Amino acid sequence: MSSVTTPAPVYTWTADEAIKFLKEWNFSLGIILLFITIILQFGYTSRSMFVYVIKMIILWLMWPLTIILTIFNCVYALNNVYLGFSIVFTIVAIIMWIVYFVNSIRLFIRTGSWWSFNPETNNLMCIDMKGRMYVRPIIEDYHTLTVTIIRGHLYMQGIKLGTGYSLSDLPAYVTVAKVSHLLTYKRGFLDKIGDTSGFAVYVKSKVGNYRLPSTQKGSGMDTALLRNNI
């Protein structure tokens, strides 16, 4: 005798159960969304590097979570229309995830900085201070960059980089590394304010797929490729 396979029961979520779920988890979901909103709203490198790193982690997790959800939708599609859209969304998400990694690796090869994997931007400003390369992300490749020294503290575009520097330590050039090319900024103006403070303005002077010679004698490395990044 042939056995008859009993179909698996189909569970449906009623409106009352959905309302009960929201009532039970509403407070926790509200706290989580409030936390994420605060991080995304106030996560800037010029304000708090710690908060900015948390923001980057949240943004970085968005793509794998999106891919997981789209795959889940493919497995448990309601009908063929939903299945088709889910497959398209999954392919798009995976392609964009791969493109992100490819661009990040290319930028990492150019700069040697882990900031290359920043999901927010592919622009990394680089400044060589007495042989030490500082690399930080910026949203845009501005026409001018401002470097400020306040009582020995070094700031670039408002982002604190280090201490123990003077105006005489500022280089003639700074760069902004992108995935496909390098932007060079030449120092166009320098003004001293007091004995230990001042600022310099760097103006975009050259754009191309090239590298600058290192300021470290005998190092054989390029300015945008120094490995002692901070």
UniProtKB/Swiss-Prot annotation:
Component of the viral envelope that plays a central role in virus morphogenesis and assembly via its interactions with other viral proteins. The chain crosses the membrane at residues 25-45, 56-76, 85-105. One of its GO terms (molecular function) is structural constituent of virion. Keywords: Glycoprotein, Host Golgi apparatus, Host membrane, Host-virus interaction, Membrane, Transmembrane, Transmembrane helix, Viral envelope protein, Viral immunoevasion, Viral matrix protein, Virion. InterPro entries: M_CoV (IPR002574), M_HCoV-like (IPR044362). The keyword Transmembrane helix applies. One of its GO terms (cellular component) is host cell Golgi membrane. Signal peptide: none annotated. Residues 46-55, 106-228 are intravirion. The lineage of its organism: Viruses, Riboviria, Orthornavirae, Pisuviricota, Pisoniviricetes. It is found in: Virion membrane; Host Golgi apparatus membrane. This is Membrane protein.
